[in-house]
């Protein structure tokens, strides 16, 4: 018997609230934090989010009868209270994998964080976490190369990599920019980098900048016998221009390029990652604009979701925050998304804000890049927090050294001392001060850096904290 079409407005709960539903292995699972408008029941709010982010609209439509709505609809299957927050609650929603185009993080985001975020019945909405089923993960190409391949390309093993963002970030001519790159690489760094807003400005057009940077890299490599690199930012006004810059970087021998994946867009980023894989070029990812989306604890997208999206879209490095520097970052939450970048399988762990198990299959891991207000005194904590597969990037903490290019040498000595102490079984965060003092006895560069920044701290409370019960 044909189904009967009943016109009119139907309560979302009748179709999209399914507390008895058991999610399938192939379902994409999402956890939303919801604050409904006054008078809107929780059950209605969670069902509305499931509807508006999948197949629903505000009224019943006759075209529902032309498809298998039960197969395609999102299902709100559970809710939980948010510890310490009486207004908010968590809603867990399962989406059938067929709702999403294969390999398209753009399509996933368009559904999960699209129109639903402007829904009037919801006062605040935040996407806290997503479980991507392995069946979907395997449709994405992911990082162009990954951690192990990068170590092989750069011939660097057994320690975090060391970098520096060239400062001032804007205003240097191409020749002076190249000089700064050379001094940093010659002093002992593995990488230098463009900052996120270095593109092609009147003071330094991109091609001139690329040429002087490659000249600096080649000179530093000849003098040190080490592989060196600089993240050449190919973010551009159009995809065609972006690929033109990437092609030129490859032509002149650059080992690594850079992209601002949020401001540049996920379509551009996924395409660039595929190009890097095909052309043997490493890809560093900057997260400029992330805090607009993730810093508000009640509305937006949590950074752990942006981390997962980047791993699917593609990048060999991603900025993750530092915990100890000048930028926002809760320690346990940061450790959580670092694991989501690097590990093959991550278990649910609410103490670190991870709501779902996540299986990445054979997808390569991503280097965690930490930068922002860090200096030599932070080195013991950074090596402890980030471990081996990280890029520690000191901008002002390199170029702010009173002796100029000695800042690079100071950071290299501090890193080597901490890695050696770690390998000998020392607890770096407890013994770090003594480790650095001992190393400084043989390094005037490190000693001066320690004296310069001994009073510098960034002691501000984290805005976006993990949701835990107030004591």
From Swiss-Prot:
Disulfide bridge positions per record: none
GO terms for biological process, alphabetical: reductive pentose-phosphate cycle
Membrane-crossing residue ranges in chain numbering: none
Catalytic activities: 2 (2R)-3-phosphoglycerate + 2 H(+) = D-ribulose 1,5-bisphosphate + CO2 + H2O; D-ribulose 1,5-bisphosphate + O2 = 2-phosphoglycolate + (2R)-3-phosphoglycerate + 2 H(+)
Cofactor binding mode and count: Binds 1 Mg(2+) ion per subunit.
Residues at the active site: 167, 286
Transition state stabilizer (site feature) positions: 326
Database matches in PANTHER family: RIBULOSE BISPHOSPHATE CARBOXYLASE, RIBULOSE BISPHOSPHATE CARBOXYLASE LARGE CHAIN
Protein purpose: RuBisCO catalyzes two reactions: the carboxylation of D-ribulose 1,5-bisphosphate, the primary event in carbon dioxide fixation, as well as the oxidative fragmentation of the pentose substrate. Both reactions occur simultaneously and in competition at the same active site.
Miscellaneous: The basic functional RuBisCO is composed of a large chain homodimer in a 'head-to-tail' conformation. In form I RuBisCO this homodimer is arranged in a barrel-like tetramer with the small subunits forming a tetrameric 'cap' on each end of the 'barrel'.
HAMAP family, per the entry: RuBisCO_L_type1
Entry protein name: Ribulose bisphosphate carboxylase large chain
């Amino acid at each position: 018997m044909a189904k009967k079409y009943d016109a009119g407005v139907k309560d979302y709960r009748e179709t999209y609230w399914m507390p008895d539903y058991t999610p399938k292995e192939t379902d994409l699972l999402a956890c939303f934090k919801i604050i409904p408008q006054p008078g809107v029941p929780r059950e209605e709010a969670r069902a509305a989010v499931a509807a508006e982010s999948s197949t629903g609209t505000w009224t019943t439509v006759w075209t529902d009868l032309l498809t298998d709505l039960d197969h395609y609809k999102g299902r709100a299957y559970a809710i939980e209270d948010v510890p310490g927050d009486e207004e908010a609650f968590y809603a867990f929603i399962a989406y059938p994998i067929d709702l999403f185009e294969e390999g398209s993080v753009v399509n996933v985001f368009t559904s999960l964080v699209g129109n639903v975020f402007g829904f009037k019945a919801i006062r605040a909405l935040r996407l806290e976490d997503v479980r991507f089923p392995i069946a979907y993960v395997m449709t994405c190409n992911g990082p162009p190369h990954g951690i192990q391949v990068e170590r092989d390309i750069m011939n660097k093993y057994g320690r975090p990599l060391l970098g520096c963002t060239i400062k001032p970030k804007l205003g240097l001519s191409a020749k002076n920019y190249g000089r700064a790159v050379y001094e940093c690489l010659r002093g002992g760094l593995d990488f230098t980098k463009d900052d996120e807003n270095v593109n092609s400005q009147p003071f330094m057009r991109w091609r001139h900048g690329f040429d002087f940077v490659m000249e600096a890299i080649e000179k530093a490599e000849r003098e040190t016998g080490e592989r060196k690199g600089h993240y050449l930012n190919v973010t551009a006004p159009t995809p065609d221009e972006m690929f033109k810059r990437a092609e030129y970087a490859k032509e002149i021998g650059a080992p690594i390029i850079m992209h601002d994946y949020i401001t540049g867009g996920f379509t551009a980023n996924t395409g660039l990652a595929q190009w890097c894989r095909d052309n043997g070029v490493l890809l560093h990812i900057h997260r400029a604009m992330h805090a607009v989306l993730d810093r508000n604890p009640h509305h937006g997208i949590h950074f752990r979701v942006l981390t997962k999206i980047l791993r699917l879209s593609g990048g060999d490095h991603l900025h993750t925050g530092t915990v100890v520097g000048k930028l926002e970052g809760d320690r346990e939450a940061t450790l959580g998304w670092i694991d989501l970048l690097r590990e093959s399988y991550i278990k649910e762990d609410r103490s670190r804000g991870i709501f779902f198990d996540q299986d990445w299959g054979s997808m390569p891991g991503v280097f965690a890049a930490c930068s922002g207000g860090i200096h030599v005194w932070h080195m013991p904590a950074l090596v402890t927090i980030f471990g081996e597969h990280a890029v520690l990037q000191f901008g002002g903490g390199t170029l702010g050294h009173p002796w100029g290019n000695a800042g690079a040498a100071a950071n290299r000595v501090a890193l080597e001392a901490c890695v050696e102490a770690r390998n000998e079984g020392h607890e770096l965060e407890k013994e770090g001060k003594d480790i650095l003092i001992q190393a400084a006895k043989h390094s005037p560069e490190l000693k001066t850096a320690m004296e310069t920044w001994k009073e510098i701290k960034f002691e501000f409370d984290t805005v976006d904290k993990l949701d835990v019960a107030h004591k």
